[in-house]
Amino acid sequence: MGWLADYWWVVLLVLAGMLIGGVKALRRVDATSYLKNRPELPPHRDNNAQWDEEDDWPKKP
């Protein structure tokens, strides 16, 4: 870990570059265009349907 004490500034520069690159990439995203042209979701199957019929709660008088 001695190299980290000597080269902490390099690690900081790499992290700052990643942060700046991420912000730039997110600014290029056009959410309204995506929402207008988004693909339809395929129908999903309810995997809990077979357990929904079981009633584990006690009956109320």
Swiss-Prot record:
One of its GO terms (cellular component) is plasma membrane. It is a single-pass membrane protein. Residues 37-61 are annotated as: Disordered. It holds the Pfam family UPF0370. Residues 37-47 have a biased composition (Basic and acidic residues). Residues 51-61 have a biased composition (Acidic residues). Keywords: Cell membrane, Membrane, Transmembrane, Transmembrane helix. The keyword Transmembrane helix applies. Its main location: membrane. The keyword Cell membrane applies. The chain crosses the membrane at residues 3-23. It is found in: Cell membrane. Belongs to the UPF0370 family. NCBIfam families: PRK13664.1 (NF010185). This is UPF0370 protein SG1720. It comes from Sodalis glossinidius (strain morsitans).
